[in-house]
Amino acid sequence: MKFEKIFPETLLELIRKELDNSSSFEYIEGIQPFLMKYDNVPYYVYIKNLSSAYFKDRPGTTRAQLPKKVSFDDIKKSPNIFIFLGYDQENDVFVCWDFNVVKERLNVSKSVSFYSRISYQEEVEEGEFLRINLKNGDSPIVFKRKSICDFFDKINTFFDVKSETPSNSTRPVEEDGKIKSITEEELLKQLRPLIKI
């Protein structure tokens, strides 16, 4: 597999090409990382190119590296979720790692590597979200770039959302008789194993 580096501005353009189609999306500021809102929830998003991890015994392993940045100090203190996406240009795929784990690892060393597998990046189809269970305990989600709006629509089903501000209600949000979101942690824990990702 050939890995080409894409500039930060181009990575922003690629994600915005899809997000700008959603009325739920609002771009606020920045390039990499950038601040956005989706359904009025603020997120910091940082996209890096995926490349080979150069493991001789696991040639199909890819990685995205999270560098040390001054701007990450403020993001780490922020109550906003920090989304780290690895981008595979050849397959037009994003890999997202657990944002709780990623945020904890911000600026802990010169660079922190997050891993994926090329086989999943090649096989994932549009509208599909594949969870990889890696040997290091990480369980990233792999999906097509064109599915980024669906990703944000379903973000609460992929990883636990740890809110740093108390919520007024834990009741499910209903619209037209359909449950649109569930925020009650105990119920979410029971439902997650039943949801096919």
Annotate the PLM regions.
Residues 1-197:
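Intrinsically disordered, charged low-complexity linkers and terminal tails
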